[in-house]
Amino acid sequence: MKTLGEFIIEKQAEYPEAKGELSGILSSIRLAAKIIHREINRAGLSQDILGVAGSENIQGEAQMKLDVFANETMKKALLAREEVAGFASEEDDNFVAFENDRAKNAKYILMTDPLDGSSNIDVNVSVGTIFSIYKRVSPIGSPVTMEDFLQEGRKQVASGYVTYGSSTMLVYTTGNGVNGFTYDPSLGLFILSHPDMKMPTEGKYYSINEGQYVTFPMGVKKFIKYCQESDEATKRPYSSRYIGSLVSDFHRNLLKGGIYIYPTSTVYPKGKLRLLYEGNPMAFLAEQAGGMATDGFNPILDIKPSELHQRVPFFVGSTSMVKQADKFMQECAE
């Protein structure tokens, strides 16, 4: 039995030049995940932490009370260790520069969707936390700048998510494979339960909000029809599974094989998901597990961000399924 802490130390020892900053950040995320896990498990017993907070994020979306709690928990956990120079969240209008001397000398910045799928909390459906870590590009010792956050996803040094469901799991990569750890609340420890995770090349699930079908581009409509057709050679029809929480849908497809799609639409002409907080971290995980992630045409990780809350169409999952979806998109664009 190997704990997350032991695994982090073991991996750090493989890099003699490492000074432990990244390990410290992962430990901060581990602590935040435990606190968020505890609060989510109390949600049904305390109305104080359920429902709408009465505020909106920069996207104009109503913030749930647990959105605000998870965001502040992540921020405080990172501030306590002073291993990151700056922090950006889907829930905040702008990035936060950590101004104390040690933080200003830190090498890394972190971006997060602190509680993905939070609208599901009231009905006891799985939610998650997504995170993404980069090396800063601004001079060490100075406050972070916008350029530190507007980096291509290919430059991530680590990304991951925590899924709060029937069990709580932390899944992450540092660019050398994907590993999953299940939380044992009786011990207060994350235990390595899913070493070297691989996404099946072929899948049998497609995850998309079909209630929005009439708003989708033709390429997506044709792919949905393809998924529903019978064909023994490709083991179709595929099964439709859509939870409404990116982390939950992605996690199932990582284990079982499948594709998750949130495309452009007449309602969201640029897509709905955020490139920096959702697209890049999940795309990095997918590629590290042998999967694929695109915007329907090009790899997500190659997109150069132009703004902090940039939206993106998102196709992620088993390689064969993403390639097939991209093929329909490209044919309909010609």
Curated annotation (Swiss-Prot):
It comes from the Bacteria. Binds 2 magnesium ions per subunit. The keyword Transmembrane helix does not apply. Substrate binds at residues 116-119, 209, 242, 272. Its cofactor is Mg(2+). It catalyses: beta-D-fructose 1,6-bisphosphate + H2O = beta-D-fructose 6-phosphate + phosphate. The keyword Cytoplasm applies. Its EC number is 3.1.3.11. Mg(2+) 2 binds at residues 113, 116, 278. Its main location: cytoplasm. Pathway: Carbohydrate biosynthesis; gluconeogenesis. CDD domains: FBPase. Mg(2+) 1 binds at residues 90, 113, 115. Keywords: Carbohydrate metabolism, Cytoplasm, Hydrolase, Magnesium, Metal-binding. It is found in: Cytoplasm. InterPro entries: FBPase_C_dom, FBPase_class-1, FBPase_N, FBPtase, Fructose_bisphosphatase_AS. Homotetramer. Belongs to the FBPase class 1 family. This is Fructose-1,6-bisphosphatase class 1. It comes from Actinobacillus pleuropneumoniae serotype 3 (strain JL03). The gene is fbp.
